[in-house]
């Protein structure tokens, strides 16, 4: 039961950190390449 409590307390924290990192990465990529239609042609 302790393992389940540990999992439930760490999974949301890890998901929040991961999605925050991913959102920041996508924002920086979008800031560098503002037009997404041009990106596949490079």
Curated annotation (Swiss-Prot):
Primary location recorded for the protein, binned into one broad class: plastid
Keyword Plastid appears in the UniProt entry: yes
Primary role: May help in the organization of the PsaE and PsaF subunits.
Entry-linked SUPFAM superfamilies: Subunit IX of photosystem I reaction centre, PsaJ
Lipid bilayer topology: Single-pass membrane protein
Pfam families the record matches: PSI_PsaJ
Location in the cell: Plastid, Chloroplast thylakoid membrane
Organism superkingdom: Eukaryota
Name of the molecule in the record: Photosystem I reaction center subunit IX
Recorded GO CC terms: chloroplast thylakoid membrane; photosystem I
Keyword vocabulary terms for this entry: Chloroplast, Membrane, Photosynthesis, Photosystem I, Plastid, Thylakoid, Transmembrane, Transmembrane helix
GO BP term (any one): photosynthesis
HAMAP family, alphabetized: PSI_PsaJ
Transmembrane stretches, start-end: 7-27
Family: Belongs to the PsaJ family.
């Amino acid at each position: 039961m302790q393992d389940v409590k540990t999992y439930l307390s760490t999974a949301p924290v890890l998901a929040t950190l991961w999605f925050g990192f991913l959102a920041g990465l996508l924002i920086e990529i979008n800031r560098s390449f503002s037009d997404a239609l041009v990106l596949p042609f490079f």
